[in-house]
C-alpha cells in the first residue's frame, strides 16, 4: 500500500502550522487595537504591553523546546527548536495593514519594543542568533527597507551586508525574468539609477507592465531620457528594422506586448500622448527637440507634406499662408527633411511645383552636394533652363512684398466703417493700458475672448502654445501678442498680471466659444501653470455650451436646424455676421502679423461677444431663466457635467446635425485620414461601433460571434500586408486572450465603452485616428 500520511501529519508541518496559528491570533489582537478609536498614545501603550507578553511567551516556549531536546525521539529530533528571532521576523511579515501608514507605525512600535525587551537578555542572543536568522533579517530589510534601522541593531548586521543581499536578490530576479519584483526592490531602496534601461525598464515595457514603468520614470531623469531615446530610434523606420530589434527578446520569451505600437503612425501617436500626458503631468525633464530628434523631424516632415497638400491639391491655402508656414518650418528642419520636402515637390513633374522646389532650395540654402539631393534637381539648381529660371524669378518677385501693418497705423475690425478700433498689446506699457481699462469696467459686463495657437510641430512640451489672445469689450478690440510677451525679460510678471486681470475679477465675465481649449492653452504658459489652477476659474462662460443648453430646451428658441453649431454658423444666423475663414490655416507664430491676420483674429472675439449677447437677449425675450442657463454654461460646469446623448442609433440623427458634431473631432494641423483608408475588424464587444463606422464609409469586417472572429484573425495572420486590418477592441480579459493568440495583429483599444453612448464612441474613434469627412461625401448612409 502507498504512504497515506498527509502533509499535515508531518511533524515539521505540524510545528509550522502551530507557529502560524499563534501568530495569526496575535495579529487579530494587534488589528483590533489599531482599528480601535483610542488615541495613538493609548494604542502604542496597548501594543507595548501585548508585545512584551508575546515575547515572554516565545522565550518560555523556546527554552522549553531546548530543554525537551534530549527526550525527543525519531523524526522529532529533526525539528528546529522555537526561536524568538524567527518569530519576530514572521510577525513582521504578517502584520495587519502593513502597506498603510498605520502598518508602518505598528512595525516600528513592535521592533522598538523587541529591542527594549532584549536589552537584559544577552544569553538569548548567544543561544538563538545564527547566521541563518541574520541572513533572513537582511532579506527582510531588502524586502522592506523602512524596518532596516531596527533590524540592523537587533540582528547585529551591517548596512553593507544588506546591500550585498539586495544586489544578489535583484540579480536573481533579473536572471529569472522576474522584472517586476526587481523593479520594486530598486524603487524601494532608491537605487533606480544603478541599473540601466536595458536591465529592468525595457523588459518591463516588453511584458506590458506600464504602471511600473511609469513609476520608474517618475523617479529617474536618466531613465526618462533613455526611454524617449528608445522610442525615438524607431520613428520613420521600416517594419523590418523595428522587428529585427525585438527578435532577440522574442526568442528569450520576454515579449508579451503588442509590438505594433512601435511601428509607424501608432508610434508617433503614442509619443505625442506621452509628451502631452505624462511629461506634462509629472514634469519630466524631457523636450521634444532635445531628446527626440527623429520624432521632431518626422512631425515637421508630415507638416510640410500637409501644407503642400493644402496649397496645391486641396487649394485651401493661399500663397501668403503657405509661405509663412514654409519660412517658419524649414529653418527648423534637418537637411534630410528639407530635401525630402523638395523631392515631394520635384517628383510630381508639375511645372508649378518644380518652381516651388527651386524657390525653397534657394531660400533654405541647402547644400547642393548633400547626399540626399537627387541628381536632376541638383543639375537644375546649378544650370537652370531659361523656362525654369524665368519662373523662379517671377515667383521671387511676387513674394518680396508682405501685407503687414504699418507702424502707427490704426486698424479696425470693420475697416470700411472704421468700426471697433484694434489695440495691440506687446509690452508692459501696453499691458498697463489694457489692465486700466479692464479695471474701469462696470459690474456685470462681458468680454469676448478667443486665442490662436502656434503650429504644433514648432513647439516643445515645455513651450507655451499661445500665439495671440483676442479680447473685445466697450467697442474696442485688443490683440495680445503672446510671442512678443514671451520675449520680454519680465514675461513671468506680465503673464501673472494679465491672468489675474482677466480671470480673478468678480466684476465681469469672459465669454468664448468652446473656450476650455483656449484656457488649457493659457495654462501651457509656465508661470501661469505654476501659480494657478484651472478649476479655480469662476468667471468664464462657454457660448457653445450656452447655445446647446438653449437648444436642449427647444430648437425653436434660436430657430436653429442643429443642436450643435460652429461659431461662424451662429454668427451668420443670429447677428448676420459673415466670418471670413481664409486665414484659418494661418501660421500665428510668424511675425510680423499681416493686416488680414490681425483683423481676422479679433473678428472671432467680436463674433463670440455679439452671439452671446444675442442668445441672452432671445432667452430673456422668451421669459426663460437666463441666470440659470448662464450658470449651467460656465466652463467648469461644462467640464464636470458631461452632456449625455440618448440616441441609440446614429442613423436616426439627421446628417447635417451629425456632421456638425463629428467634424469638430479632428485636428486640422495634423495629417488627416479618410474613412476609406482604414481597414478594420471589430471585437464582438464593439459590434455596434463597427456597424456605425460602416455607415460612415469605413471598411469594417463584423464577425457574427467570437468563434468567427478568432477564425478571421487566424486567417489574417497569413494575409499580405495590404490586406491586414486593425482590430478594434476594449481593455478586457477577452482582449488579452486575443492578443496572446494573435501576437502579430495590431489592436486599438477603446476605453470606457460602457460609459459612452454610440455617438460618443464614434467621436472617440475619430479623435484617435484624426478622421476627416466632408459634408457632401456621397458614401454616407445616414439620413439626410
Swiss-Prot record:
Residues 422-619 form the 3'-5' exonuclease domain. Pfam families: DNA_pol_A_exo1 (PF01612). The lineage of its organism: Eukaryota, Metazoa, Ecdysozoa, Nematoda, Chromadorea. The keyword Transcription regulation does not apply. This is Uncharacterized protein ZK1098.3. One of its GO terms (molecular function) is 3'-5' exonuclease activity. Gene3D superfamilies: Ribonuclease H-like superfamily/Ribonuclease H. One of its GO terms (biological process) is nucleobase-containing compound metabolic process. The keyword Hydrolase applies. GO terms for cellular component: cytoplasm; nucleus.
